[in-house]
């Protein structure tokens, strides 16, 4: 290997190191700002995504992931005996893991934090500007999202939570 190759490899290594450092610093800043958000929470309770985002959320996940798995699975069922044993095991394991992952998304309980700047649900932060208003239906406070910006968020009703939301959103 000549000296140009060594220099090129060294520069590529340094660039990769610099990019990794920038990425780590960005993650550090994100975690730091998230801790500040969580510290300023006005109201905290636990609920699962299925209750928070409603039936449309579950239907969206089913349509995005359930139908393709169903069609691929039914297609592979026709040729199941012709597939190699290792591939069948891997495919069965992957589908089982994926289905459990989807159930986890729907039914695992996440902390919901209502803050001064917005609402922190699971791993998403939605500012108050993303909502048009709120309404109360079936013992739930429904935060109505702006079209194309956010989706409606369903929160368990409590008087304290309603008083907090009333300061930031108008009742529709």
Curated annotation (Swiss-Prot):
Q: What is its main location?
A: membrane
According to the record, the segments passing through the membrane are 7-27, 59-79, 89-109
Q: Name one GO cellular component term.
A: plasma membrane
Would you say which domain of life the source belongs to?
Answer: Archaea
Q: How does it sit in the membrane?
A: Multi-pass membrane protein
Subcellular localization, as worded in the UniProt entry = Cell membrane
What are the UniProt keywords, alphabetically? Answer: Cell membrane, Membrane, Transmembrane, Transmembrane helix
InterPro entries the UniProt entry points to: DUF5673
Q: Which protein family is it in?
A: To M.jannaschii MJ0695.
The entry's protein name is Uncharacterized protein MJ0803
């Amino acid at each position: 290997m000549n000296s140009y190759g060594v220099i090129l490899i060294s520069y590529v290594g340094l660039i990769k190191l610099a990019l990794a450092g920038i990425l780590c610093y960005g993650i550090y800043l994100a975690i730091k700002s998230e801790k500040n958000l969580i510290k300023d929470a006005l109201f905290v309770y636990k609920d699962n995504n299925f209750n928070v985002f409603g039936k449309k959320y579950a239907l969206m996940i089913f349509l995005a992931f359930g139908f393709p798995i169903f069609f691929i699975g039914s297609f592979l069922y026709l040729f199941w005996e012709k597939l190699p044993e290792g591939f069948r095991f891997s495919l069965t394991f992957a589908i089982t893991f994926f289905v459990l992952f989807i159930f986890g998304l729907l039914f695992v309980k996440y902390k919901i934090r209502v803050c001064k700047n917005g609402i922190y649900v699971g791993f998403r932060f939605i500012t108050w500007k993303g909502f048009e208003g709120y309404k109360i239906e079936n013992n739930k406070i429904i935060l109505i999202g702006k079209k194309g910006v956010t989706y409606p968020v369903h929160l368990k009703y409590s008087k304290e939570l309603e008083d907090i939301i009333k300061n930031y959103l108008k009742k529709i």
